[in-house]
């Protein structure tokens, strides 16, 4: 099991960031450039949850089907139910709080590998994960700072 934690501050307000996390429309892959549009599929969206499949081309392609839950104010969590690499129960969690006019974003990523490829990825994440995830998140925040308002919880 690999756990990566990091935090960063941004000028993007909490509601705007959470709306981007919970936007399951066709624009999602453009908001989150690390997502492969070919792997993105929305299965169901409710008032505070969404079941989706997402993936990236990293390491020959890793996909995950799981549930986003934003029922707790200021928290968005994606829990893996099925993946070609990681065990059910692996997760991403974003805790977002106001920081001046922007946000403090605290991220926890827990990966439980179930394949040899995933074990290698988990090893790499234990060394480079914080930097990689932070850089990916910073790209999204830069996009959000320059775009119009986004509606979350949509498909």
Language model: regions and residue ranges:
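Hydrophobic ligand-binding cavity/cleft-lining segments
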Residues: 1-47
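Short, surface-exposed coil-to-beta transition loops
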Residues: 3-5, 52, 61-65, 87-92
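Beta-strand elements of well-folded, non-transmembrane domains
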Residues: 10-12, 56-60, 72-74, 84-86, ...
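A short, structured loop/turn motif at beta-sheet edges
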Residues: 11-15, 45-46, 69-74, 95-104
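Hydrophobic pocket/interface hotspot
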Residues: 17-21, 28, 78, 105-107, ...
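Short amphipathic alpha-helical signal-transduction/dimerization elements
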Residues: 22-25, 129, 133, 137-149
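Glycine-rich portal/gate segments that line the openings of hydrophobic small-molecule binding cavities
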Residues: 29, 38-83, 139-143, 147-155
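Beta-strand/loop substructures that line and gate deep hydrophobic ligand-binding cavities in soluble
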Residues: 79-135
